[in-house]
Curated annotation (Swiss-Prot):
Residues reported to bind deamido-NAD(+): R140, K173, D180, H260, K261
Function summary: Catalyzes the ATP-dependent amidation of deamido-NAD to form NAD. Uses ammonia as a nitrogen source.
Superkingdom of origin organism: Bacteria
Keyword terms: ATP-binding, Ligase, Magnesium, Metal-binding, NAD, Nucleotide-binding
Catalytic activity: deamido-NAD(+) + NH4(+) + ATP = AMP + diphosphate + NAD(+) + H(+)
InterPro entries attached to this UniProt entry: NAD/GMP_synthase, NAD_synthase, NH(3)-dep_NAD(+)_synth, Rossmann-like_a/b/a_fold
Gene name of the encoded protein: nadE
Protein name: NH(3)-dependent NAD(+) synthetase
Family affiliation: Belongs to the NAD synthetase family.
Amino acid sequence: MTLQQQIIKALGAKPQINAEEEIRRSIDFLKSYLQTYPFIKSLVLGISGGQDSTLAGKLCQMAINELRLETGNESLQFIAVRLPYGVQADEQDCQDAIAFIQPDRVLTVNIKGAVLASEQALREAGIELSDFVRGNEKARERMKAQYSIAGMTSGVVVGTDHAAEAITGFFTKYGDGGTDINPLYRLNKRQGKQLLAALGCPEHLYKKAPTADLEDDRPSLPDEVALGVTYDNIDDYLEGKNVPEQVARTIENWYLKTEHKRRPPITVFDDFWKK
């Protein structure tokens, strides 16, 4: 088995999908989880205005709507959380995403004050954060807020991780990567677009250039620039297609060096890091 085949198998990626079937699969997955653990009353998700959180948010709300109707349990809710750092440049996209999702509840937590306070506390201890590390601080502060909300609403935190993100480890460890349940896991980027199109999402929300937008020195830096490959390249690779050798090497290097991000904390029983 080639490394490409191993990666595809590990991430559960498929060369083709039926959008309606995958929508149903994700909704049923979320519903089954909630029914298995009846003490869970809410799904909590940060909404950025990008493709992934828009899709995950819509699926969460659809799952909650169906489950309330089927069970009569009106205590179930989906909570969409806005988590700007100061003023967000694409705030209108966030509002458009919320209008599309129609969440039961929308909360806004501006993380700038908390990030600056943490940065100052570290500075006083003699640690000056780089712009890159400050970006990770933002991602972790966003996740901390979501877990606080989940803790106070008997909820779980929903993630947006999918195959095209997991393969490169393009997320912050214990930041946006630290979630309870990931309904998009298995899909690549173009497949996520297919689901949103089938759901009637406004096109500009999934045709915009994806960006983590964490670094102050490089605001709105496109993911594809940071990664050195395009999402079309990544999607082709995940679909088992032949890609240029340099593209394959770049993707595989990302996968191998970020393996620790896709695993629990390393113990004496792990040996993947020795290979």
